[in-house]
Curated annotation (Swiss-Prot):
Recorded family membership: Belongs to the universal ribosomal protein uL16 family.
Role according to the record: Binds 23S rRNA and is also seen to make contacts with the A and possibly P site tRNAs.
One GO term describing the cellular component: cytosolic large ribosomal subunit
Gene Ontology biological process terms in this record: translation
Organism: Vibrio vulnificus (strain YJ016)
Key words, A-Z: Ribonucleoprotein, Ribosomal protein, RNA-binding, rRNA-binding, tRNA-binding
Entry protein name: Large ribosomal subunit protein uL16
CDD domains in the cross-refs: Ribosomal_L16_L10e
Amino acid sequence: MLQPKRTKFRKVHTGRNRGLAKGTEVSFGSFGLKAVGRGRLTARQIEAARRAMTRHIKRQGKIWIRVFPDKPITEKPLEVRQGKGKGNVEYWVAQIQPGKVMYEVDGVPEELAREAFRLAARKLPFKTTFVTKQVM
């Protein structure tokens, strides 16, 4: 699963997930999966979607993952009273804003890419859309 090798700080504030995304264009492949909604994407969800796509397109083409989970999420253990400091880091998330291209694929027909992205989108917690590279 994806997570940073080292970080400056172990724990971060919860913060908010506002604004619009950077990385809104398909830049590496021919087709992309773009977020329509906003939310948190866990490392497990990123990996589950990647596996679904990889299994469908088999060994053809190439897949790019354009998101990285760099925010630690902490949780306190079950049945522990409040206080006594912040909980331990349980998992890592990537914060996703609308318009972010999360996955790209190249070297496969459009129909195959569409179906692979449809399978991947079922693993994600917000709405997505299929996009193609803009040729000028």
